Every structure is written in structure tokens, then in C-alpha cells.
């Protein structure tokens, strides 16, 4: 299914692309950068935004530390999540339990604090929507991260290793680490999925080069990020077996089995079949 994103500007396209659930086309060409057509250079001000990890914002090279609480900062990250956003969507994400009038009042207070922290109106209202001020140049690590994922997936990309490695390098930690808002938790899982994909694909490349230990290190790194994604566990078990380290493959399976038992779960059938084949 191909959708013209101009008709649905309120969808979080970048996170959909990270999950391989969408692509953006322009004149039949796959878009691999600047998915929201934001100014990236030459603006009146230059913002550098790092959302992978704790979340930092830099204005003209200087870190912003005058947020007056976490809400103004998170409001800015939320505004970057999609091309445009409505006030109703903001209030629902941040203050779902407040009456509408109360939520609107808190929103305006938060927006004023955001503008005060950056010393200019970073959010502008246009046609019923809020969006990041088009006069501001924004460099966003999420855009760069997802762009690297797209290039790694493209069949025509010659140096896939560079694309996957760039995605790995840009992932400095979980999205807005330390926050537990529902929209943040959802995005965190989606971008983590892209990171696991990059690690897994990079491991495949290293295996093809005969660099098995390097590949194993990448896969173990993926498990350290998310120890519930069984396809990665199967890759690790198979690699241990290929290296002649069947006891380590069996131990890895037993660790996974113990973790799942604590949750009342069992390994996937494919994982159990692989384990049986390795120890037989």
C-alpha cells in the first residue's frame, strides 16, 4: 500500500519507516533523508537534536539546559515526531486525564516555557496545526538513523555495511531514555526494532566475510538491548554451533528458557527445534 503522505501529514511517518511499515516516495524516487521536508541548514537558528539516548537539544552549538521542567523539552520532541500536530493530539498525549480547558491551559504554559528556553518561537501555528518553525534549521538524529536504515534496505545500495554501521553508531541509547510516557514507550520500541535490524544485518555481512567472532559480538549486543527477540537468540545459537561451541549454544538456550519460564512462557517452536538439532 502506497499513501501520499501529503494527504496524511499527521501520521508519524519516520517511526513507520523505522518499522518497515512505510516508505516515502517523491517523483517515484525513494526518499532516504529529510522525510518531513524541514530546513536542515541556512536557517536563522541552527538546532541539533539527539533523541536517541536521554535526549539533548543544542542551539547554535550550545546545549539547552533552561527547560523549567521536562514537559517543555518533551513537547519539542513530540512536535518533531510528525510533520504537523494538533493541539488536541498534544493534550491527549501529555494530559489525557485533565479536562479539556485545563489541558489547553497547561499546554500554553508549557509552550511558553519551551519558547523561553530556546529564546524564540520554535512552534508555530498554521492552518489549525502546530509545527516546527520553518525558519529554523534542524538536524535530527532520528531522521539520520532512519535514513541509514532505508539505505541499508535498498537493493541498489552498494556499501550496505556503511549504511548499517551508521545506524548502529547513531543509536546512542533508547529513545528519550528515562521517560515513561506512553507515546515515548511506543516510539522507543519502534526505533529499537530498527536498531536490532541494523545489528542483525551487520552480523550477516560479517559472517559472509568470515568474521564470525565479530558477528557474534554484534548479535550479543542486540540481545543486550532486547533479550526477548528470539530470532536474534536463534542466530546466536546457530553461530555458536557453527563455531563448534555447542555447549555455549545449549547454555544460551537454557538461559533464554529460564527467563521465559519466569514469565510463564516457552520458547518459540523454531527456537526449540534449533536447540534439539544442535544437541543431537
Language-model features, listed with the residues they occupy:
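Short boundary/linker motifs that mark transitions into or out of structured domains
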Residues: 31-71, 121-131, 173
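Intrinsically disordered, charged and Pro/Gly-enriched terminal/linker segments
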Residues: 65, 80, 99-104, 127-280
